[in-house]
From Swiss-Prot:
One Pfam family from the record: S-AdoMet_synt_C
Listed name of the protein: S-adenosylmethionine synthase
Recorded family membership: Belongs to the AdoMet synthase family.
Top class in the EC scheme: transferase
Amino acid sequence: MANDYLFTSESVSEGHPDKVADQISDAILDAILEQDKYSRVAAETLCNTGLVVLAGEITTTANIDYIQIARDTIKRIGYDNTDYGIDYKGCAVLVAYDKQSPDIAQGVDRAHDDNLDQGAGDQGLMFGYACDETPELMPLPIYLSHRLVERQASLRRDGRLQWLRPDAKSQVTVRYVDGKPDSIDTVVLSTQHAPDIELPALREAVIEEIIKPTLPADLIKGDIKFLVNPTGRFVIGGPQGDCGLTGRKIIVDTYGGAAPHGGGAFSGKDPSKVDRSAAYAGRYVAKNIVAAGLASRALIQVSYAIGVAEPTSVMVNTFGTGRVSDAVITKLVREHFDLRPKGIIKMLDLLRPIYEKTAAYGHFGREEPEFSWEATDKALALAEAAGVEPTARVA
């Protein structure tokens, strides 16, 4: 008997209040890294009706106009009208940054005898994941959820659906049979809108112009449940509807619940923070394992102690899909990937102003030129070392 189950993931648009906060935090990080790539940054943002608060710890030689960066980011997202509850020109921006604690800095900045022996900026555990459900090696529900809100933003920006507003959420439920995606069961999309659009017209346009063009044709089987703005009116949104905070969408940022999460958010953190850099490295490792054909699913866990460079643990789980044992793959990971914090920074070239782009529509599964952790350049070496035939993605 086939093992049949449903699995759901969600995403949110760039205009969701928590994502507004994430993007401001990462825009500030990028501006700092452009001037001083060795800065220590932990930039937190709160945004509410007409108000943005910037706080956290920053140690840098850069000279940054934080208020202007916050306003520019809000404008780019699309909050350019007082009717939206926050607009880039009229909102108040409060700045309350401190410097990084010297107690933390002493462990992060020590070089020891090895120039790659920088200690981790904190203790913690991080996960990376990849699977063969999509060409991007991502779980299908989160991949489709991202594409839906990305399309919502595209149609809003180019004016095809002029009544769309920046805030939106999506949710996709996929039916799996024997562990593989079989069909789309339910799609939820809630979008902020202008007050004068009638609900029936909105629902028809969202289904025909946003949802249907996004769904893979081979997974449309039978009747799909489309739930568009199921509560009806959604005029008040963005930071006016809910207070936004950096780091509150960590499952949206990663794998949509298909893999565990260590709990540490990404946005606003420079790459000395392993919450971010080691999660990126975990994705890089997992993606190369799957791309090499060593497994069809791979979960990586790494953990760190503050001030210590070497990971305290490295774990690989292929859920029984491995062509060699998990112990062999773990050994290969240790041989082919430098998972010390400074080794990760060097391996993935992370001291670049590349982070604002990550702060909406997922940090993983996007073929962006800056996203070095999405490369599969280690896959062939892994396949050869394991003695297996590489997949078509590598050959």
